[in-house]
């Protein structure tokens, strides 16, 4: 099977790539994995979802044992030993990987500026997260496969405003 020829120019545009904020989180010291997961799913997520929709967030995922979100408990981290090889030899020890996907950086900044966010969510992070050890990064994401099908960008996502 031959591989397709790459395009002559970089065809990535604002229509087929999105920004993704990734939070590599640690749970608060002394908190169990189960208590962390429960707080994220039953308290933090319900508080956060509507605010994200209000400001145009396209996708938010959190890695946890519950099927709707994903955390990185010891149980699943140990699966890495089955696929480790010389290229994939370092296992991340974060408790949570949260990703927020949006088209416009200003949309995410509006969330952080929202008075409701400041009143209800900023302080809540201290209840479950080790905010001193957790890390963040942001970058463009481009989609190549969606639900088992090769795609061109983000078909079906709302276009730029």
UniProtKB/Swiss-Prot annotation:
Its EC number is 4.1.1.-. Residues 29-131 form the EthD domain. It holds the Pfam family EthD. This is Decarboxylase. Disruption phenotype: Impairs the production of monodictyphenone, but leads to the accumulation of endocrocin. It comes from the Eukaryota. Belongs to the tpcK family. Keywords: Lyase. Decarboxylase; part of the gene cluster that mediates the biosynthesis of monodictyphenone, a prenyl xanthone derivative. The pathway begins with the synthesis of atrochrysone thioester by the polyketide synthase (PKS) mdpG. The atrochrysone carboxyl ACP thioesterase mdpF then breaks the thioester bond and releases the atrochrysone carboxylic acid from mdpG. The atrochrysone carboxylic acid is then converted to atrochrysone which is further transformed into emodin anthrone by mdpH-1 and mdpH-2. It catalyses: atrochrysone carboxylate + H(+) = atrochrysone + CO2. Pathway: Secondary metabolite biosynthesis. The keyword Lyase applies. GO terms for molecular function: lyase activity; oxidoreductase activity. InterPro entries: Dimeric_a/b-barrel, EthD_dom. The gene is mdpH-1.
